[in-house]
Amino acid sequence: MTSESEPNTSLPFSPIQQTLPATPSRSTSQVSMVSAEALLSHSSPTKQLTPSHRSSLPSALPYNTLLNAPAGSPALRARASTASSSRAPSVLDDARVEHNDSETQVLEITPPMDNYELDGGSDHTSLPSDASSIKGKEKQRSNDRNEIETVGAGGEMALPSGDARKGLKELVRRSTTADKGYGGHDHRRLSEKLSQTDENLQILITQSDKMSYSPRLYYVLTNAGKPVFCSHTRPSEDDVTNLMGVAQALISIFADDDDRLRYIIKGNHRVAFLLKAPLYLFCVSDWGEPEHVLRLQLEYIHLQILSVVSSTQLLRLFQRRSNADLSTLLEGTEPFLSNLIDCSQYDFSFLTSTLQPLRMAPALRDTSAAALMPPSKFKDLLYVLLIAGGHIVTVLRPRKHSIHPSDLHLLLNTIASSSALRTTETWLPICFPKFNPSGFVHAYISYVLEDVGLVFVSADREAFEDLRVWKDMVLEKLEQDKTLSRIQEAIPLHPYTISSVGCPGLRHFIYKSRQHVQITQPIWEAPYEDGSTNQKRLVTTYQKLHDAVHAKSGQASALKLVYISTEHEACLVWATKPFELYITVSPQLSKSAVVAAANNVAKWVLAEEGRIFLKDAPVF
């Protein structure tokens, strides 16, 4: 399993190439076993977790690559404290269909395209040569040999020790059967076809109705097997403790061979693991999504924990006591983790490491930013944010500094998860793992209206009073020309419907601007209402398309165009250097009509770019 980072994961304010930390990859193992049924049990209680006290932790990093500044600079000092008060038809001509013995059909289509309009132009990225394709085949076969799928004897699994541990390990190794794909499909055969193809556009017709789309289950434990968090409430704490013990034992079996357990497949269920010593995280899902999607969600859970307990605190705690209990430090954070999990299920900005700012008039955004320009006396001020309706209005940052989208996701999630943060002035110590995982910054949070808030992030833990005085000055500027009331009026206008594009047959789309590292999408409408099976199916399809254009499942190369069609809908992803576009249309639309719809959406977003994206954010 290989994982490739997003081409650009910084905000428009500066070019950052770093994304969520990739899991170290050595040899990987894929395991499917009847005895893993314990991992699929829904019977486990919720462990409540959260912060109590944080000590000052100087940064141990000699250099911060995200901010291009020495870690010892004033802006990077990490301090902690407690809170104080168209020729479209020509594109899809001459297609050929290739069948295999699974339920999946692959339709390869030429010619390749990578231009601003889907019209079969010649401006495109060259495809791999035959030699590179052969190399990709050999690499895929090598990866296949490293994957193991096992069906063991039924019954309960006891925690292994000594010879029993070796016996379980040998059972896993030798009980290899024919490899079957996730959700009943030969996904490795399909992945090999994706790797070997010399075309840029493929049509994948898959059967996804077998997925039941049960709520995903998330677990966090220590490397000693102690429970830290589980995402659902069940009556017996013993059940979750035993479950964590089984997971810890399975992870340890492969760790003995310097290997990392990445996932287990059992029927339609997938159990994905993320190992971030001293914490282990895993998730159980039957949605049929690519493995990297679950691992990315686990990454965000890990980052949310680090926002409360920095990596330095965590390591020191477990160095002193290997079986330490995190429940005291994490007491009260369960709402933060639960809200993060809920948002990550359907919010595409998590998968793409982007933001979706408030849709508003460009002039109003510029006026707001001008009122937020800080005085020069704030030497340790890092970021200034204006938030409305849970979305960013504008962000100001120091020159040569930047902020990673995942850090902003953590901040916005923390604010959204606590009503207290939105009703009183707050001085919040928080760790931004992408900024500095070793220590804390401090955020002054004040909601000047019910749904409009100011956030000032500083490295100076003593700056509360100064920032409080400055907030009053900013508020006065925003009220002088009624900017504040106009921002409040823009909040209900932020959502828009698919009819705004004016394209018959178009049901939904997601547009990612690579330049601005932001996305836009209409609201979910029928038949994709919030929480419906149709919405879950479509989100999973988008995730598969994202996987294909980023080659995150071992493909030899990334694709530029991928089209998935089922009896319910047809979806197309179009990846270019400036943007990625995901559209959903009626399955009855012709191929030329689908291409025309993609062009229409791209043109509409270009015309609305000033309103839907935050461009040219000010610096100080």
UniProtKB/Swiss-Prot annotation:
Keyword annotations of the record:
Autophagy, Endosome, Membrane, Protein transport, Transport, Vacuole
What top-level branch of life does the organism fall under? Eukaryota
Q: Does the keyword Protein transport apply?
A: yes
Query: Per the record, which residues fall in region Disordered?
Result: 1-165
Query: According to its record, how does it sit in the membrane?
Result: Peripheral membrane protein
Is Protein transport there in the keyword field?
A: yes
**Function text:** In complex with CCZ1, is required for multiple vacuole delivery pathways including the cytoplasm to vacuole transport (Cvt), autophagy, pexophagy and endocytosis. The MON1-CCZ1 complex acts at the fusion of vesicles with the vacuole, through its regulation of the SNARE complex during the coordinated priming and docking stages of fusion, and particularly at the stage of tethering/docking.
Q: Where is the composition biased (Low complexity)?
A: 73-90
Name this polypeptide is given: Vacuolar fusion protein MON1
Biased composition of type Basic and acidic residues is found at 93-102, 135-148
Q: Which InterPro entries match?
A: FUZ/MON1/HPS1_longin_1, FUZ/MON1/HPS1_longin_2, FUZ/MON1/HPS1_longin_3, Mon1
Localization in the cell: Endosome, Multivesicular body membrane; Prevacuolar compartment membrane; Vacuole membrane
Q: Which GO terms describe its biological process?
A: autophagy; protein targeting to vacuole; vesicle-mediated transport
GO annotation, cellular component aspect: fungal-type vacuole membrane; Mon1-Ccz1 complex; multivesicular body membrane
Task: Cite the record's Polar residues compositional bias ranges.
Answer: 1-33, 41-58, 123-132
Family to which the UniProt record says this protein belongs: Belongs to the MON1/SAND family.
